[in-house]
Amino acid sequence: IFSNAALHWVKDHNKLLKNTYTALKQGGIAVWNFAGDGNCETFYGVMRKKIKDDRYKEYFADFEWPWFMPSKAEYETLTEKMGFSEVAITEKNADRYFANADEMIRWIDQPSLVPFMQCVPDEVKKEFRDEVVEEMLSKALQPDGTCFETFRRINVRLVK
């Protein structure tokens, strides 16, 4: 079983691990990577602040954070009692410099803002989005014109 950069969208990794174990034949292998603790710190900081802003907080009253991004230690704890014969979990720093502001804005627009934009009514979407972009660029833009964001990965290899 293989997955690349998708499983942070799956919130119940306990169930994921149990189903993976069930699906694998004896000696079968699961290999995946997904976002881990510390991923996109700038963006998530901006968003946590923005959804608490008095102008927008009513739209996020029932909002559930859409990602599961554990630390290596947290994931090791999750896998401990699943029954796998081998478990290897590593963390990777995959920090990224976007070539320019436009490249970062494209990343903000798709996929990063999608779960938030679904909560905001049409009449304030543009204002909300523009404020997020402006704050992100104020924090991420480097003197050379690139834009920096933290990216942290969890790499998992499981053998049944």
Predicted segments, located by residue:
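A conserved beta-strand element that flanks and buttresses the S-adenosyl-L-methionine
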Residues: F2
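A short His-aromatic
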Residues: H8-V10
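Conserved Class I S-adenosyl-L-methionine
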Residues: F63-K160
